[in-house]
């Protein structure tokens, strides 16, 4: 149990002081079966998928370009929206406790089938070596690429299939999930406490975080929250919350000032489906839901066909003989349908890897050939877990590099606008490169949105301390996490694990891009 600092509908908790009472409650089945869960907090993370493109220049077949200097743009605008729901502090403790129960049983179930433990990678701590450190997506991607290379040494052609489950979390069938949950517990039906937790995950309610702002705006910069009220609650009550009490929360709803929404995930038959993404229990439920699917793929593809199978959440990859690809593809799609899920047809891809001559000396190397409607597209990369693999090389996914560059440009634009607003006629306006570099070298986890500056390297930990007037004031204690990762340390880890220097070369344009961005935004 850890103290969390985020704002929610109910009070933040003092775990260090009251952990025994919290533990007693969450481990009491009779308490949990009657417990009324709070509404979740809902927000949406938008991930930009396509850049502006020029209709005449630098236009490839996918209508994408990464050229920063072009001005004659049209828009090919798409954004991936990921809905996130997160629970109140106490509810999160309950979800975390029941997630630990299910996760222990799930891990035991994986180890009962030889090879199944290796197939499922996401949301699990898979120990790397005797140091106790866990594997990362870098290790998982390398294992797949190494498998393709190893097979190419003894096979003329190696086949690869990739699948993506469409809207995974928001499409889980409730009846199937409940059955798999009770089966894992070894029960005919869920015990009352588990049943109540299940209902809170499937028949959930939520509020929109933006509805708690001072003014609700459909576009433009969002207004802030009622900082005067938040400060008053902190000072007088000694906790962080949008509301000072349950009565305050209920009155706000009764007065029509805050709307409560119900689970909005429905299938084509208008039947409610899905679980929230963002709860401490969501990950293990997603893995549990596909447990039988993973077992069937292991038996059919790995054991019967001699294939190689890995699933990372909703990303599926299979390495097999080329002659078996069509049969395996149909089998996977039919099996997913039995789970009342759907494979994204636009993200289903087929590859053949084989040796190909690449120079006048007739030298050959392992090369990827993407299979597209009966044709082959040479050198089209296999994209998996943020990497592009062409057989003869592995590099960071180009869109991830572009995202890093966009963040850099965003920082320059904000700093330039600030310099222009604050300019003194006697002082030349300037943006200092070293300050920019310090910002874009900050930890990956501190990146707060595509168009916002990066947060500080250290994290301020705040504590509410009662003073002699029986009021609470905020005490700030800086905390430096030396293990935080930034984009450059990630690149170094890639180079170490893959034993390749190609990754740092992908960032060779950063200085040029920085200078170009400064020249453009500072002199506009």
Residue ranges and their predicted role:
Residues 1-77, 494-524:
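Non-catalytic, polymerase-adjacent accessory regions of viral genome-replication enzymes
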Residues 51, 56-96, 113-132, 162, ...:
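Short, conserved non-catalytic motifs in the polymerase core
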Residues 99-174, 196-216:
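Active-site-proximal segment of RNA-dependent polymerases
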Residues 119-125, 309, 317-320, 349-359:
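Beta-rich nucleic-acid/ligand-interaction surfaces
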Residues 155-312, 317-329, 379:
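Conserved polymerase palm-domain catalytic core
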Residues 199-253, 346-432:
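A conserved non-catalytic segment of reverse transcriptases
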Residues 273, 277-280, 365-524:
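Active-site and adjacent loop segments of nucleotide-processing enzymes
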Residues 328-336:
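Short amphipathic alpha-helices in soluble, non-transmembrane regions
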